[in-house]
Amino acid sequence: MAVLEILSIPDPRLKVKAEKVTDVSTIQTLIDDMLETLYATGNGIGLASTQVGRKEAVVVIDISDERNDPLILVNPEVVSGENKALGQEGCLSVPEYYADVERYTSVVVSALDRDGNPITIESDEFLAIVMQHEIDHLSGNLFIDYLSPLKQKMAMKKVKKYVKAQAK
């Protein structure tokens, strides 16, 4: 297993649309590496393959306090959603920036698990928000894309400052 580099805005690879996985046996190492990368962040709760420069439609999520209950979603899709509300979001690809985003508070998501079995997840909790955020990444969308141009500029400025400070 390996810790992968997490891309930051404005990297154009974050805008790439993921491709459906046709054979889950080909992504087992990717899943393991994505989980290791997620856990290495210390505070991340979700990671999409496009955030590590990969094109396969894979999402890993772990919202457990102990960080030992991963949810693997292959080819995930939001089938339905209800009741929109504003909630604060952040992103590993937009470090140190948080903003309110409107999302469904209740969703149904269909996907494959890491073994290729079809799964359906219904959630009206925090997981619903996290799944939407990560699935957006697979479409080449970031949470800041929902913000005004001014707030997008502010996010870019903050991330550039953060990346510059990390490079020192």
Curated annotation (Swiss-Prot):
UniProt keywords (A-Z) are: Hydrolase, Iron, Metal-binding, Protein biosynthesis
Q: What is this protein called?
A: Peptide deformylase 2
Necessary cofactors: Fe(2+)
The UniProt function text for this chain reads: Removes the formyl group from the N-terminal Met of newly synthesized proteins. Requires at least a dipeptide for an efficient rate of reaction. N-terminal L-methionine is a prerequisite for activity but the enzyme has broad specificity at other positions.
Listed InterPro entries: Peptide_deformylase, Peptide_deformylase_sf
**Cofactor binding, per record:** Binds 1 Fe(2+) ion.
UniProt GO BP: co-translational protein modification; translation
Which parts of the chain span the membrane according to its record?
A: none
Q: Which organism is it from?
A: Vibrio parahaemolyticus serotype O3:K6 (strain RIMD 2210633)
Name the Gene Ontology molecular function terms of this record.
metal ion binding; peptide deformylase activity
Pfam short name (any one): Pep_deformylase
Keyword presence, Cytoplasm: no
Q: What class of enzyme is it?
A: hydrolase
Active site location: E134
EC number(s) stated in the UniProt entry for this protein: 3.5.1.88
Q: Which residues bind Fe cation?
A: C91, H133, H137
Catalytically driven reaction(s):
N-terminal N-formyl-L-methionyl-[peptide] + H2O = N-terminal L-methionyl-[peptide] + formate
Family named by the database record = Belongs to the polypeptide deformylase family.
Residue runs in coiled coils:
none
